[in-house]
């Protein structure tokens, strides 16, 4: 099974009041969405949290359809060059705030058939 996810995060101030949103699409139809208020965070933390939420939500959608994560392919669309490059392995993860978030993304990715970023 293949699902697309779109996610974004942002902050007012950096750090500042932050939030993120994620949606799961099956073809061109949105099948699930989630928004989260993050209190105070940087833009990059909000972007990572949006990705984590998107992956978790896609796994939940697949589960409701009787599909295991191991059978799920996810195409991620997001505008954060930092997150895309780090998760694609092209950039190092240097900032200590990013490391646990990136580790959580990698944990989720390890349960899936495939994840691609664009």
Question: Which residues does each predicted region cover?
Answer:
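RNase H-like nuclease fold core
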Residues: 1-45, 49, 53-63
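RNase H catalytic domain
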Residues: 10-14, 51-118
């Amino acid at each position: 099974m293949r699902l697309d996810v779109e996610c974004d995060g942002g902050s007012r101030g950096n750090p500042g009041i932050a939030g993120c949103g994620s949606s799961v699409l099956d073809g061109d139809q949105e099948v699930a969405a989630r928004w989260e208020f993050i209190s105070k965070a940087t833009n990059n933390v909000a972007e990572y949290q949006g990705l984590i939420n998107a992956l978790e939500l896609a796994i939940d959608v697949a589960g409701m359809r009787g599909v295991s994560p191991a059978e799920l392919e996810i195409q991620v669309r997001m505008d954060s060059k930092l997150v895309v490059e780090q998760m694609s392995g092209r950039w190092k993860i240097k900032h200590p705030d990013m490391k646990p978030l990136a580790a959580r993304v990698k944990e989720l990715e390890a349960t899936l058939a495939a994840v691609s970023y664009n």
